[in-house]
Amino acid sequence: LKALAHDVQRNLLTPIDEIGLPVRVETRSGDTPPDRKKRQRTRPPHVLLTTPESLSLLLSYPDSFELFRGLKRIVIDEVHAFATGKRGDLLALALTRLQAIAPAMQRVALSATLANPEGFREWLAPWGEIDTVELVTGEAGAPAEVEILLPDAERVPWGGHAATWAIPQLYAQIRQNRTTLIFTNTRFLAEYIFQNLWDVNEDTLPIGVHHGSLSKEARRKVEGAMARGELRALVATASLDLGVDWGDIDLVLQMGAPKGSSRLLQRIGRANHRLDQPSRALLVPGNRFEFLEATAAKEAVDEGKRDGEEFRPGGLDVLAQHVMACACAAPFQEGELLAELRASLSYAWVDDAVWQRVLSFVETGGYALKAYDKFKRIVRDGEGVWRLSHPEQAQRHRMNAGIIIDSEMLDVRISAGRGRGGRSLGKVEERFAASLSPGDTFAFAGMSLEVVKLQDMEVLVKAAKASAMIPSYGGARLP
């Protein structure tokens, strides 16, 4: 979503600047500097591009009522990517709060790969009033051209997942096409495929790598190079799945199983942004089971079938976070807040008994933590109004809120000498960093690096001639 927000901002600013409109467009995410976030609350832009998590945090400030009082509309791009999960739950609750602050606010959702449009209409509608949501269907473009890449011997290996057998053929495709976007399912595989391609890059073609653990500067540099048409190939993860529009891409390669027809269509859609010409994609299975998955996905795309997760009741852990965010913004009456959140499809099912359980959990931390004062987050006064137990609870909430599970990460920085860290390259997980010692080498951010020192949650490195390891990362299980 960060890459999508940055790309939409760039695409909006170009016509705004050309026309000379006095319109400010800004992003707000984990990449946004604290000083800009603070300024946005006192001098908000005309258009704010953000994520569900950042919006929820923004609503936790007391000035959020004044900030959003004049909100005209909220546009949810690529709604299929998160509406059915916990990020969708968080956004659904934020929508109910925004609707309470700005009742005339209009809701708009966009997607090119919906399997169940009626379900999304109901999710978007306040109080489930589906008739208030108009479904607008765009013109269908040329059907995608999807093929499965096979070894020269026409036998896919029995085992393995990296598809290293295909590296010479991948490089040949890169040479034949103007710009190639290569998708992998993990950050480890993105670095691994990049290193293997670089080893056979006899023409020294400009090839980049992009994933969520790289530093903001590294990601923006690669995104800018792609937007300017300076790269011949880019190896990426789901960090570039959503709606990033680079017109020069004429081929998409999917390494490994595509994990569904909708996901595959989303990635194919990054190529050839013209309705009258098909997007081209090659699926590269790592083993024979992935070949079967790739075949099924190709047949589904050819037949115009979509898949995706079904809507389910909203998570109570997300609801507890929302209650805490509301308490940070202002004291609340439990009956009024319950009526507000029931306006969303995700939480229309919450009855009084469930609501009291959630409030009790936020109040005490639950039966396992109620003996500890720091988990007593909210209290109810004599008039039945809930408020923060202490002002410090607001800062604790904003520091720890979110529904994306993260592992402990260490910064990777170029050593500036004398034990000082210089430019940041990104982050690796603590468990990987714990396996490193000074002198060890590993591949990261498209470079071979040697460990100089580990200190203060940082891995100080310098350039190396060879690498032996690639960082691996924990994450959500693939479908």
Where are the regions that the model predicts?
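Conserved nucleotide-binding/hydrolysis modules and their immediate coupling elements
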Residues: 370-479
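Helicase motor core with emphasis on the C-terminal RecA-like subdomain
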Residues: 1-329, 334-383
